[in-house]
Amino acid sequence: MRQILFRLIGILEVAGGFYGMATVLPRLLGSGPLHAAVIQLIAFALYTFTLVAGVLLLENSERGIRFSSISQLLQLPLIATPIFSYAFYCGACVNVALVLHLPPRPELTWHFGNQGLLLAVGGPSASHLGLNLLALLSWLILKLR
């Protein structure tokens, strides 16, 4: 069972990392201002790291487990405030968030076969704080081997 779950996590990391790299590369090459290029470079590095972590995990290496754990921790938080925003997912995500507006309300979003990175100074007027439950579950599976 452990091997099947590790393979599933690895496949999602490889697919999401490759898709993210393929999506970001044209924007990286065509980005204009320096701050846009820096964010695209960070995105490219995160997707590359996740792809490498997935490949190493599929090879059943100890380094793959460690890198995949780091990748899952990077995908865990969802922070969107008027001052700063960060969210990263690669392959799939199930986000549970609390929208801090009057009245506060929970929010559930999910994506499969997709990638995304939100890294910005600034964000929505109604703050969102949440967790990627799929990343949390994957991290726990990797830690409780």
Map each language-model feature to its residues.
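Topology signature of small-to-medium multi-pass alpha-helical membrane proteins
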Residues: 1-145
